[in-house]
A protein has these predicted regions:
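Catalytic binding pocket for nucleotide-activated donors in carbohydrate/polymer assembly enzymes
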Residues: 176-222
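C-terminal alpha-helical cap of glycosyltransferases
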Residues: 246-262
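Donor-nucleotide binding loops and adjacent catalytic segments primarily
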Residues: 89-165
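Short, charged/polar "capping" segments at the starts of alpha-helices
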Residues: 22, 44, 59-60, 103-105, ...
Length: 262
């Protein structure tokens, strides 16, 4: 990678990879005028000009940008937000999504929780699955056998699904910020250990279950049921979401990048 970058001689290098090594960033600084890292908590992050760490808690790192202010929300969400009519009074439809791949199959864990709860089985679920999800046949068979009210959406943009959901059950990734932008109260489950470092859910008071690989199913059932049953809690969350500075992340990032000395 370094030899290719040297041949290009760019004015800026943006690293969208995790845990960059210090040596790599030092070498980049010899080549490029500006080095920007994304979601980097490795040793190299301290040497970059800017680190866009929206998903992590602010730890005071001098060159890092934290929080929803710097999260770039895709245009599709901006286009679909006008269709949001959030009513905290009733819950009818629950959106479930754990990314495009869900390698740990947290989706099936949540479906088993729903199937084992007479209360949760009464609701309708929109299950958003990505192109790399490998357990579609298992999901289809399970939902049919257990007579779950599930509408499976394959490769469907979440921006078009969130306006029609009353609550969501989501992985603890950038989707949490997208749900916040769409004013969608959500139950959050970390799909792996690294996602446990993402703490934005605390700021808006989204119910959090923990690491999906470790938590008991009872915790998931409790958190989902709590959000469905407590309309005051949902209204409280929506109020928190309405007060966020979110949606202009690209403009804020551009402003920060322009301050990097040449």
């Amino acid at each position: 990678a370094l030899s290719l970058i040297k041949s290009i001689k760019p004015d800026m290098v943006i690293n969208d990879c995790l845990d960059n090594e210090a040596f790599y960033i030092r070498e980049l600084k010899k080549i490029s005028l500006k080095v920007i890292n994304i979601e980097d908590i490795g040793e190299g992050s301290f040497l970059a000009d800017k680190v866009i760490n929206c998903v992590y808690s602010d730890c005071g790192q001098h060159n890092a940008l934290y929080g929803e202010k710097y999260m770039d929300i895709r245009d599709a969400f901006h286009r679909n937000k006008p269709f949001v009519q959030r009513d905290s009074e009733f819950v009818k439809n629950v959106l479930v999504n754990f990314g495009g791949e869900d390698p740990n199959n947290i989706t099936m864990k949540v479906l088993r929780v729903i199937a084992n709860s007479d209360y949760l089985k009464t609701f309708h679920y929109t299950l958003a699955l990505g192109s790399r999800y490998r357990s579609l046949n298992e999901v289809e068979a399970f939902t049919k056998i257990n007579r779950l009210k599930v509408d499976i959406k394959l490769n469907t943009d979440l921006a078009t699904l969130m306006p029609h959901a009353d609550i969501a059950v989501l992985a603890n990734c950038r989707t949490v910020f997208e749900a916040a932008f769409m004013l969608l109260p959500s139950v959050i489950i970390s799909a792996n250990a690294r996602e446990c470092l993402h703490t934005f859910y605390r700021k808006v008071d989204f119910p959090y279950c923990g690491n999906g690989l470790l938590i008991n199913n009872d915790i998931i059932e409790h958190k989902i049921s709590q959000l469905i049953l407590d309309k005051e809690y949902r209204a409280h969350i929506i109020k928190n979401l309405e007060q966020l500075e979110i949606g202009q992340g690209l403009a804020h990032l551009e402003s920060e990048i322009m301050t990097i000395p040449r």
